[in-house]
Amino acid sequence: LDILRVQEQFSRGPGGMRMHLHYAADLNWRILDDYGSDELKAQYMDKFQDKTIFTCFALTEQSGGTGADIHTTAVKDENGDYILNGEKWLISHTDCCEFAYVIAVTDESKSGDERLSAFFVPVDTPGYEVTPMPHMMGARGAAHTGLKFTDMKLDKKYLLGEEGQGMEIAIHSLSVSRAHIAASNLGMCQRMLEMSLARANDRITFGKPIASRQMIK
Protein backbone atom coordinates (compact mmCIF):
# COMPACT_ATOMS: atom_id res chain seq x y z
CA LEU A 1 0.00 0.00 0.00
CA ASP A 2 2.89 2.39 0.66
CA ILE A 3 3.95 2.39 -2.99
CA LEU A 4 0.36 3.13 -4.04
CA ARG A 5 0.26 6.11 -1.69
CA VAL A 6 3.45 7.36 -3.33
CA GLN A 7 1.89 6.69 -6.74
CA GLU A 8 -1.13 8.79 -5.79
CA GLN A 9 1.07 11.76 -4.85
CA PHE A 10 3.30 11.47 -7.92
CA SER A 11 0.19 11.54 -10.10
CA ARG A 12 -0.58 15.09 -9.02
CA GLY A 13 2.33 16.26 -11.19
CA PRO A 14 3.54 15.72 -14.77
CA GLY A 15 2.38 12.53 -16.45
CA GLY A 16 5.89 11.24 -16.95
CA MET A 17 6.43 10.95 -13.20
CA ARG A 18 3.36 8.81 -12.56
CA MET A 19 3.96 6.65 -15.62
CA HIS A 20 7.59 5.94 -14.77
CA LEU A 21 6.88 5.09 -11.13
CA HIS A 22 3.89 2.93 -12.03
CA TYR A 23 6.00 0.89 -14.46
CA ALA A 24 9.32 0.84 -12.60
CA ALA A 25 7.79 -0.27 -9.32
CA ASP A 26 6.45 -3.51 -10.71
CA LEU A 27 5.92 -4.34 -14.38
CA ASN A 28 9.49 -3.42 -15.32
CA TRP A 29 11.06 -6.40 -13.52
CA ARG A 30 8.18 -8.68 -12.56
CA ILE A 31 7.67 -10.35 -15.93
CA LEU A 32 11.24 -11.61 -16.09
CA ASP A 33 11.16 -12.61 -12.42
CA ASP A 34 7.93 -14.58 -12.85
CA TYR A 35 8.47 -16.11 -16.29
CA GLY A 36 12.13 -15.87 -17.27
CA SER A 37 14.35 -18.94 -17.43
CA ASP A 38 16.90 -19.50 -14.68
CA GLU A 39 19.58 -18.47 -17.18
CA LEU A 40 17.93 -15.13 -17.96
CA LYS A 41 17.16 -14.36 -14.33
CA ALA A 42 20.72 -15.11 -13.28
CA GLN A 43 21.99 -12.82 -16.01
CA TYR A 44 19.63 -9.86 -15.60
CA MET A 45 17.69 -9.68 -12.31
CA ASP A 46 20.61 -8.10 -10.46
CA LYS A 47 20.73 -5.42 -13.13
CA PHE A 48 17.19 -4.36 -12.27
CA GLN A 49 18.25 -3.96 -8.66
CA ASP A 50 21.21 -1.74 -9.50
CA LYS A 51 19.11 0.09 -12.12
CA THR A 52 21.44 -0.57 -15.04
CA ILE A 53 18.62 -1.91 -17.21
CA PHE A 54 15.03 -0.83 -17.85
CA THR A 55 12.34 -2.30 -20.09
CA CYS A 56 9.29 -1.39 -22.13
CA PHE A 57 6.14 -3.48 -22.57
CA ALA A 58 5.10 -4.03 -26.20
CA LEU A 59 1.65 -5.56 -26.53
CA THR A 60 -0.60 -3.01 -28.28
CA GLU A 61 -0.74 -2.70 -32.07
CA GLN A 62 -2.14 0.11 -34.21
CA SER A 63 -5.11 -2.01 -35.26
CA GLY A 64 -6.22 -1.79 -31.63
CA GLY A 65 -4.82 -5.22 -31.00
CA THR A 66 -4.07 -6.48 -27.52
CA GLY A 67 -5.34 -10.01 -28.00
CA ALA A 68 -6.62 -12.20 -30.80
CA ASP A 69 -6.01 -9.51 -33.43
CA ILE A 70 -2.26 -9.18 -32.80
CA HIS A 71 -0.33 -9.48 -36.07
CA THR A 72 3.35 -9.37 -35.07
CA THR A 73 4.81 -12.82 -35.78
CA ALA A 74 7.69 -14.82 -34.35
CA VAL A 75 8.52 -17.72 -36.66
CA LYS A 76 11.08 -20.38 -35.77
CA ASP A 77 14.06 -20.88 -38.05
CA GLU A 78 15.92 -24.14 -38.64
CA ASN A 79 17.88 -23.70 -35.39
CA GLY A 80 14.82 -23.11 -33.23
CA ASP A 81 15.51 -19.39 -32.90
CA TYR A 82 12.80 -16.85 -33.73
CA ILE A 83 12.41 -14.35 -36.58
CA LEU A 84 10.14 -11.45 -35.61
CA ASN A 85 8.25 -9.25 -38.04
CA GLY A 86 5.57 -6.69 -37.28
CA GLU A 87 4.82 -3.42 -35.53
CA LYS A 88 3.70 -2.23 -32.11
CA TRP A 89 2.05 1.08 -31.23
CA LEU A 90 1.57 3.35 -28.22
CA ILE A 91 4.55 1.90 -26.36
CA SER A 92 5.98 3.87 -23.44
CA HIS A 93 9.57 4.01 -22.13
CA THR A 94 11.11 3.17 -25.51
CA ASP A 95 13.47 6.12 -25.04
CA CYS A 96 15.07 4.73 -21.88
CA CYS A 97 15.00 0.94 -22.12
CA GLU A 98 17.54 -1.76 -22.83
CA PHE A 99 14.98 -4.56 -23.28
CA ALA A 100 11.41 -4.89 -24.53
CA TYR A 101 8.81 -7.42 -23.45
CA VAL A 102 7.19 -8.33 -26.78
CA ILE A 103 4.01 -10.35 -27.33
CA ALA A 104 3.90 -12.02 -30.76
CA VAL A 105 2.14 -14.78 -32.69
CA THR A 106 4.13 -18.03 -32.69
CA ASP A 107 1.49 -20.46 -33.97
CA GLU A 108 -1.08 -19.26 -36.51
CA SER A 109 -2.77 -22.67 -36.51
CA LYS A 110 -4.06 -22.18 -32.97
CA SER A 111 -7.01 -20.05 -31.99
CA GLY A 112 -7.29 -16.96 -29.82
CA ASP A 113 -4.73 -16.32 -27.14
CA GLU A 114 -3.05 -19.71 -27.63
CA ARG A 115 -1.38 -18.22 -30.71
CA LEU A 116 0.68 -15.82 -28.60
CA SER A 117 4.04 -16.03 -26.86
CA ALA A 118 6.16 -13.54 -24.91
CA PHE A 119 9.79 -12.56 -25.44
CA PHE A 120 12.49 -10.58 -23.62
CA VAL A 121 14.07 -8.63 -26.49
CA PRO A 122 17.38 -6.72 -26.32
CA VAL A 123 16.75 -3.39 -28.06
CA ASP A 124 20.14 -3.52 -29.80
CA THR A 125 19.04 -6.58 -31.78
CA PRO A 126 19.40 -5.95 -35.55
CA GLY A 127 15.95 -5.36 -37.04
CA TYR A 128 14.57 -3.61 -33.94
CA GLU A 129 13.45 -0.06 -34.73
CA VAL A 130 11.73 2.71 -32.77
CA THR A 131 9.20 4.62 -34.90
CA PRO A 132 7.70 8.05 -34.04
CA MET A 133 4.09 8.77 -33.17
CA PRO A 134 2.23 11.95 -32.11
CA HIS A 135 2.80 13.13 -28.56
CA MET A 136 0.10 12.10 -26.09
CA MET A 137 -1.76 14.84 -24.25
CA GLY A 138 -1.48 14.49 -20.48
CA ALA A 139 1.76 12.51 -20.60
CA ARG A 140 4.32 15.32 -20.36
CA GLY A 141 7.75 13.87 -19.70
CA ALA A 142 6.87 10.39 -21.00
CA ALA A 143 7.68 9.26 -24.52
CA HIS A 144 5.37 7.02 -26.54
CA THR A 145 6.44 5.52 -29.85
CA GLY A 146 5.86 2.63 -32.16
CA LEU A 147 8.20 -0.32 -32.57
CA LYS A 148 9.00 -2.11 -35.80
CA PHE A 149 10.58 -5.54 -36.18
CA THR A 150 12.03 -6.43 -39.56
CA ASP A 151 13.43 -9.97 -39.90
CA MET A 152 14.70 -9.57 -36.35
CA LYS A 153 16.46 -12.77 -35.27
CA LEU A 154 16.07 -13.59 -31.58
CA ASP A 155 17.82 -16.40 -29.73
CA LYS A 156 15.37 -18.99 -28.38
CA LYS A 157 16.67 -18.37 -24.85
CA TYR A 158 14.69 -15.09 -24.81
CA LEU A 159 11.32 -16.88 -24.86
CA LEU A 160 9.44 -16.22 -21.60
CA GLY A 161 7.52 -19.14 -20.16
CA GLU A 162 6.25 -21.55 -22.80
CA GLU A 163 4.99 -21.01 -26.33
CA GLY A 164 1.30 -20.14 -26.23
CA GLN A 165 1.62 -18.50 -22.81
CA GLY A 166 1.98 -14.94 -24.11
CA MET A 167 -1.43 -13.54 -23.21
CA GLU A 168 -1.39 -15.24 -19.81
CA ILE A 169 1.94 -13.56 -19.12
CA ALA A 170 0.64 -10.19 -20.30
CA ILE A 171 -2.58 -10.28 -18.25
CA HIS A 172 -0.89 -11.66 -15.12
CA SER A 173 1.67 -8.89 -15.27
CA LEU A 174 -0.81 -6.12 -16.06
CA SER A 175 -3.09 -7.05 -13.17
CA VAL A 176 -0.81 -5.41 -10.61
CA SER A 177 -0.40 -2.46 -12.96
CA ARG A 178 -4.13 -1.79 -12.71
CA ALA A 179 -3.82 -0.98 -9.00
CA HIS A 180 -1.20 1.65 -9.87
CA ILE A 181 -3.50 3.11 -12.53
CA ALA A 182 -6.33 3.40 -10.00
CA ALA A 183 -4.03 5.25 -7.57
CA SER A 184 -2.85 7.48 -10.44
CA ASN A 185 -6.41 8.39 -11.37
CA LEU A 186 -7.18 9.28 -7.76
CA GLY A 187 -4.16 11.59 -7.55
CA MET A 188 -5.00 13.27 -10.86
CA CYS A 189 -8.64 13.81 -9.86
CA GLN A 190 -7.60 15.35 -6.55
CA ARG A 191 -5.29 17.77 -8.33
CA MET A 192 -7.93 18.68 -10.92
CA LEU A 193 -10.46 19.38 -8.16
CA GLU A 194 -7.97 21.67 -6.42
CA MET A 195 -7.27 23.51 -9.67
CA SER A 196 -10.99 23.86 -10.39
CA LEU A 197 -11.68 25.29 -6.93
CA ALA A 198 -8.79 27.73 -7.24
CA ARG A 199 -10.06 28.90 -10.63
CA ALA A 200 -13.61 29.28 -9.32
CA ASN A 201 -12.35 31.52 -6.52
CA ASP A 202 -10.08 33.58 -8.80
CA ARG A 203 -12.55 34.13 -11.65
CA ILE A 204 -14.62 37.24 -11.00
CA THR A 205 -17.89 38.01 -12.78
CA PHE A 206 -20.12 40.94 -11.93
CA GLY A 207 -17.99 41.70 -8.91
CA LYS A 208 -18.09 38.23 -7.36
CA PRO A 209 -16.02 35.06 -7.70
CA ILE A 210 -17.91 32.41 -9.64
CA ALA A 211 -17.43 30.09 -6.64
CA SER A 212 -20.17 32.10 -4.96
CA ARG A 213 -22.67 31.36 -7.73
CA GLN A 214 -25.32 28.75 -7.03
CA MET A 215 -24.54 26.74 -10.17
CA ILE A 216 -20.85 26.40 -9.25
CA LYS A 217 -21.67 25.52 -5.64
Enumerate the predicted regions with their spans.
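Internal helix-loop-helix
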Residues: L1-A42, D46-T52, S92-F99, G112
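Buried hydrophobic positions in well-ordered alpha/beta secondary-structure cores of metabolic enzymes
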Residues: V6, S37, F57, L84-G86, ...
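Short Ser/Thr-interspersed hydrophobic loop/turn segments at strand-loop and sheet-helix junctions
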Residues: V6-S11, A104-V105, V121-P126, T150-L154
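A short, Trp-centered hydrophobic/proline-enriched beta-strand micro-motif
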Residues: K51-L59
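Glycine-rich phosphate/pyrophosphate-binding beta-alpha loops
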Residues: G65, W89-T94, A139, V176-H180
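A structural signal for short hydrophobic beta-strand segments in well-ordered beta-sheet cores
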Residues: T72-V75
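A short core secondary-structure module
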Residues: D81, N85-V130
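Glycine-rich beta->alpha junctions and the first turn(s) of the following alpha-helix
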Residues: Y128-K217
